[in-house]
């Protein structure tokens, strides 16, 4: 393996947000492992090197693995001295008062307070984590952060140009086959003139140039399309700000053959200027399959 492995170790106080952090790194394209005993790290690296396919890893290591926690600093330092691994430690913290509030809200027990008071467990954990906190490259106090705000902070620091952290799926479909259940935005274009009733277009679909030109040259189509693209371009930054990693835009006509296909394809091409876009024509082949079965 010639690529450098980017390793982020997520650790910190219990209840400070490690689960949210791990989910954020997953959305940034990291291979994530939760609660790995540090003693297994050397074997894990051997497997990673042999695979040659993983370049970004996030590990959650905390006092749930208390029996294995000793020596973690030395193990990470050993990895950091190689050309193969670049290591960063992200330590999540919160005030005692906020941690108590979160534990009371979730009604969970602290891993170090099973036979005692909650505050005793928190104080003991702080003591045990002092060394790794001091060694951390990044300490985030989450006391005043919502899960979304913590996610945004992680994205700002760790997002790189190759992160596939947001993409758009444009889908055409036919209402006669049902709404796509995974769509975030659904547009109904059945108000547009239907090429199905034009004899020379009936056997074609919206990817064929004659049909595409027919659909897009309609005055109602052009007006609708300009308004649609203006709307979508204005709201996409909001989806990004809220931390969404994907948006599915579904455009439907009666059978999913002509109007929706032509519009979905054009929309995908235009949005691809600014965002990663995939396009799917869900029902375009269904009429052909139906004819072949008859």
UniProtKB/Swiss-Prot annotation:
It holds the Pfam family PapZ_C. Keywords: ATP-binding, GTP-binding, Nucleotide-binding. ATP binds at residues 12-19. GTP binds at residues 62-65. SUPFAM superfamilies: P-loop containing nucleoside triphosphate hydrolases. GO terms for molecular function: ATP binding; GTP binding. Displays ATPase and GTPase activities. HAMAP family: RapZ_like. PANTHER family: RNASE ADAPTER PROTEIN RAPZ. Belongs to the RapZ-like family. This is Nucleotide-binding protein LCA_0526. It comes from Latilactobacillus sakei subsp. sakei (strain 23K). The lineage of its organism: Bacteria, Bacillati, Bacillota, Bacilli, Lactobacillales.
């Amino acid at each position: 393996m010639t690529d450098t492995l980017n390793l982020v170790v997520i650790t910190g106080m219990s209840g400070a947000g490690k689960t949210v952090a791990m989910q954020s790194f997953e959305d940034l394209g990291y291979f994530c492992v939760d609660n790995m005993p540090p003693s297994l790290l050397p074997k894990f690296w051997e497997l990673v090197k042999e695979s040659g396919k993983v370049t970004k890893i996030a590990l959650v290591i905390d006092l749930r693995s208390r029996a294995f926690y000793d020596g973690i600093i030395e193990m990470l330092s050993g990895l950091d001295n190689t050309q193969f691994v670049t290591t960063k430690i992200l330590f999540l913290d919160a005030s005692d008062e906020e941690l108590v509030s979160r534990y009371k809200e979730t009604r969970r027990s602290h891993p170090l307070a099973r036979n005692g008071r909650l505050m005793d467990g928190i104080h003991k954990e702080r003591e045990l984590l002092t060394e790794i906190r001091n060694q951390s490259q990044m300490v985030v106090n989450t006391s005043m952060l919502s899960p979304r705000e913590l996610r945004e902070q992680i994205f700002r620091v760790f997002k790189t140009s190759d992160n596939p952290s947001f993409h758009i799926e444009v889908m055409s479909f036919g209402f006669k086959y049902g709404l796509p259940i995974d769509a975030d935005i659904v547009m109904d274009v059945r108000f547009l003139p239907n090429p199905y009733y034009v004899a020379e277009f009936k056997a074609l679909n919206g990817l064929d140039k004659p049909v595409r030109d027919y659909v897009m040259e309609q005055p109602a189509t052009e007006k609708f399309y300009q308004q649609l693209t203006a709307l979508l371009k204005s709201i996409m930054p909001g989806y990004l700000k809220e931390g969404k990693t994907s948006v599915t835009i579904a455009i439907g006509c009666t059978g999913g053959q002509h109007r929706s296909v032509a519009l979905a394809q054009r929309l995908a091409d235009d949005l691809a200027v600014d965002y990663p876009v995939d396009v799917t024509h869900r029902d375009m082949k269904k009429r052909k399959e139906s004819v072949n079965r008859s």
